């Protein structure tokens, strides 16, 4: 008999966690599992990528401002009972915070509960986000049969704040074959075919991604005569302020916001360098995908970076998590063709480790062990 599994996530927007959830549920063995994805809000560009054998449910049609504060007015049990209308063998909160609080409200002893943690909980504020307090977060996470972290760093940070909880590390699922196929498509953007050194980064235009730092570093390098073009793929709340600063710097032709693209891989694969300027990550999906397509990487030293790129920079450059660190890493790659060529070959080698089959099998083994 198939196990009924529910995955709960706030929405299916254009983020890394949302994308890897789609990859995972689409590839779970449907002869073993009856899979449902439920969002709190019926929004997000990733919904269309769910395969027909994955059921989709939305709690609310629209997302409203202040929802994270509003839900704290009610107990997890009250919200769960009003939101989840069926019984499941396993229910999964696929994102820390709100969904983790809600799923903890399931008191059916026959239902196993799993929480996924995608971010490095480096402060008490981050650890308690979505909960009334850190003590409530401890109580909620203690209700889970398993808490999954997407990297060892994420797990270690989680355990600094939460105790006596079963945890494990499972890497994200990437559609490696599909990524490689899409990387071959023609982006139709002329600058990718000239001799200019191209740098790219992918992510929501939000403060945690550090694109403001990347812009400052770009200006500094341009002023030093290190010519290159930066392409950012993504949308978000910082777009207006970034565009204003780009105009102030007079860099409209060399720091380009391309917006959201269904196929970022055709851009990333054609760039000379991928830069992760994030202030905080869990296990960067975008960096993983850059490695899969063989693009050299410079990443700030945030959670998961060394697991991806090596403790001693074997597969890419891990730099100090600061503007100066990003500057030093980019300058080295721009100035030293030998280093760049070395990391191009090492990126392709590391990318082979992220096979879809391996990561899906690890998740299925965890689900079957509950």
Give the predicted meaning of each segment.
Residues 296-299:
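Short hydrophobic beta-strand element within catalytic cores of glycosyltransferases
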Residues 311-323, 332-337:
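Conserved acidic donor-binding segment of nucleotide-sugar-dependent glycosyltransferases
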Residues 260, 279:
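Aromatic "clamp/platform" in nucleotide-sugar-dependent glycosyltransferases that forms part
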Residues 101-103, 142-169, 174-178:
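A short, active-site helix/loop in glycosyltransferases that binds the activated sugar's phosphate group
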Residues 15-23, 197, 201-220, 226, ...:
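A conserved mid-protein helix/loop that constitutes part of the nucleotide-sugar donor-binding site
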Residues 93-99, 117:
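Short His-centered aromatic/hydrophobic patch
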Residues 7-15, 19-23, 27-70, 154, ...:
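N-terminal strand-loop element at the rim of the active site
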Residues 243-259:
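Nucleotide-activated donor-binding/catalytic signature segment of Leloir-type glycosyltransferases, i.e.
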């Amino acid at each position: 008999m198939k196990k009924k599994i529910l995955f709960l996530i706030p929405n299916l927007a254009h983020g890394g966690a949302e994308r890897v959830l789609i990859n995972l549920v689409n590839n779970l063995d449907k002869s073993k599992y009856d899979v449902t994805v439920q969002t709190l809000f019926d929004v997000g560009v990733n919904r269309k990528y769910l395969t027909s054998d994955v059921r989709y449910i939305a709690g609310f049609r629209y997302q409203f401002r202040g929802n994270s504060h509003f839900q704290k007015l009610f107990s997890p049990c009250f919200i769960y009972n009003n939101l989840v209308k069926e019984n499941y063998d396993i229910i999964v909160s696929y994102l820390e915070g709100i969904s983790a609080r809600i799923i903890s409200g399931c008191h059916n002893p026959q239902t196993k509960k799993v929480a996924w943690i995608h971010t490095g909980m480096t402060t008490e504020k981050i650890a308690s986000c979505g909960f009334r307090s850190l003590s409530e977060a401890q109580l909620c996470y203690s209700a889970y049969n398993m808490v999954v972290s997407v990297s060892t760093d994420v797990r270690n940070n989680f355990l600094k704040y939460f105790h006596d909880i079963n945890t494990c590390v499972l890497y994200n699922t990437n559609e490696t074959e599909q990524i490689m196929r899409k990387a071959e498509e023609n982006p139709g953007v002329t600058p990718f075919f000239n001799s200019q050194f191209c740098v790219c980064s992918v992510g929501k235009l939000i403060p945690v991604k550090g694109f403001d730092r990347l812009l400052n570093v770009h200006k500094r390098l341009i002023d030093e005569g290190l010519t290159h073009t930066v392409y950012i793929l993504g949308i978000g709340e910082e777009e207006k302020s970034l565009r204003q600063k780009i105009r102030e710097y007079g860099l409209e032709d060399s720091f380009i916001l391309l917006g959201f693209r269904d196929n970022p891989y055709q851009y990333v694969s054609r760039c000379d360098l991928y830069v992760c300027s994030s202030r905080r990550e869990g296990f960067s999906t975008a960096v993983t995908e850059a490695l899969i397509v063989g693009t050299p990487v410079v990443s700030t030293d945030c959670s998961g970076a060394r697991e991806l790129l090596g403790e001693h920079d074997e597969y890419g450059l891990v730099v100090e998590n600061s503007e100066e660190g990003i500057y030093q890493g980019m300058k080295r790659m721009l100035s030293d063709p030998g280093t760049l060529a070395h990391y191009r070959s090492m990126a392709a080698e590391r990318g082979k480790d992220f096979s879809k089959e391996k990561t899906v099998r690890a998740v299925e083994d965890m689900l079957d062990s509950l």
